[in-house]
Amino acid sequence: VLSPADKTNVKSTWDKIGGHAGEYGGEALERTFASFPTTKTYFPHFDLSHGSAQVKAHGKKVADALTNAVAHMDDLPGALSALSDLHAYKLRVDPVNFKLLSHCLLVTLACHHPAEFTPAVHASLDKFFSAVSTVLTSKYR
């Protein structure tokens, strides 16, 4: 459960990211593919090379979904219901992949904003990404 301090940390960090969210989403997705090659199996139709326009575009979708989640932190299940359905029923993404991407998102954000990435912010973002992952995998049960 996200505390009021966690919500404040997540919102303020996301505000600082601003217009870079899509860029960071693409970078995190590329980092996920490089670090965890099995995640590539869900994207056989993508050009997965460094700087791929398809990876960047999908990374922007991820970032947009997270921006929506940040805006609706008090109702993540409602905000992410359609995405949960898509990933569980149509795409059948292995739930572990959400944790892997979450880790890569944390690394990407820490690389770009080291001064702001305090232990408290790190913990809050980790809890937030975990909450998002839990919602996205809730339909698997």
Curated annotation (Swiss-Prot):
Residues in Globin domain copies: 1-141
GO CC terms of this entry: blood microparticle; haptoglobin-hemoglobin complex; hemoglobin complex
Positions where Phosphothreonine occurs in the chain: 8, 108, 134, 137
UniProt tissue specificity: Red blood cells.
Modification type Phosphotyrosine: residues: 24
Positions that bind O2: 58
InterPro entries, per database record: Globin (IPR000971), Globin-like_sf (IPR009050), Globin/Proto (IPR012292), Hemoglobin_a-typ (IPR002338), Hemoglobin_oxygen_transport (IPR050056), Hemoglobin_pi (IPR002339)
GO biological process: hydrogen peroxide catabolic process
Modified residues (Phosphoserine): 3, 35, 49, 102, 124, 138
N6-succinyllysine sites (modified residues): 7, 11, 16, 40
Keywords assigned by UniProt, alphabetized: Acetylation, Heme, Iron, Metal-binding, Oxygen transport, Phosphoprotein, Transport
Top-level lineage group: Eukaryota
Its biological purpose: Involved in oxygen transport from the lung to the various peripheral tissues.
Protein family (similarity comment): Belongs to the globin family.
Protein name: Hemoglobin subunit alpha-1/2
Native source species: Mustela putorius
